[in-house]
Amino acid sequence: MKVNSDWNRERKVKFTIQDPCQIVRKGYGDAVAEDLRYVVKQVVGEENVIEMTPNKSNNYCCGGGGGFLQSGFQEERRAYGKFKFDQIIETGADYCITGCHNCHAQVHDIGHHYGGNYNTVHLWTLICLSLGILGPNEREYLGDDLKDVDVFHPETALF
């Protein structure tokens, strides 16, 4: 199976990318950020990717890592996350792609808390979408603009 962005050719849904601190900023650097972008562009279409500024190794932390999500300091976490929220909103993207669970939870939370108009989606959800398969639990991360994408639904297939 090969990924492709045909599902988004006419939709032109726009995506931005959250670079996880543990993997990019404090880990493997821009090389892995470039790998992430290569995959994302294959999956959603290069013309549908809007970069945050700054990005890659210089991207802002979302504020959800290092156990901060579970620390009990919700107000402080959200206040710190406002920088990331503003950065995402500035792109005008419909979705923020996250490759890290902590980032996903934080970006999703600050979006709802501050009234953002973007959805948060895991990278693997988009990979499944581009392959034409999507598990039942993955559809909950899609906004209304992607709920009707024609994909194979394994839970309803007849064997």
Language-model regions: role of each:
Residues 1-159:
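Iron-sulfur cluster-binding electron-transfer modules in prokaryotic oxidoreductases
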